[in-house]
C-alpha cells in the first residue's frame, strides 16, 4: 500500500525543527506533501511564494517529498482534495500535544478517513520555533544554529530590507 502523508505548517521560515520532522517522515511514508498555510493571522515575514521556494530548496535532497504547495483552506479539505489520509504533526511539548489532539479530532470529524500521526521532535531541535528564531534575528542574535543556510540567508536579507524601508 502506498502511504501518502501531508505535513502542514506555516514555515515562516522553515527551521531545523521542521526539517527534523520532514526527514524522519520520509523514512516512514512513501510520499510526503508539504502544505504551507497562507494563514494571515500569524502575520508571516515571508509571503507564501517565498516560503514555498525556501522549503523546496531546503528539502530538495529528500526524494520522498513529492509536492510542496500553498493552501488557504481547512486542512481536512486540503487532505481530501490531495487524496491523503495521513497528517504528520510535530510535537515539541505537552502544550503542542494538547493543541494537536484537539485539532486531530476536528479534522477527523470533517474528513473521517484522515488520521493524524504525531512525531516527537528530536531533543536537539525540540526548543526551536520560527517565532523564537525571528525574535532572535530582530535583535541581531545568532540564528545559524536554528535554520538551514538557505532560510538563514533569506531571513537576514528580509530583515535588512525591511529595516531599510
Curated annotation (Swiss-Prot):
Pfam families: CTP_transf_like (PF01467). It comes from the Bacteria. Keywords: ATP-binding, Coenzyme A biosynthesis, Cytoplasm, Magnesium, Nucleotide-binding, Nucleotidyltransferase, Transferase. Its cofactor is Mg(2+). Homohexamer. Belongs to the bacterial CoaD family. This is Phosphopantetheine adenylyltransferase. It comes from Buchnera aphidicola subsp. Acyrthosiphon pisum (strain APS) (Acyrthosiphon pisum symbiotic bacterium).
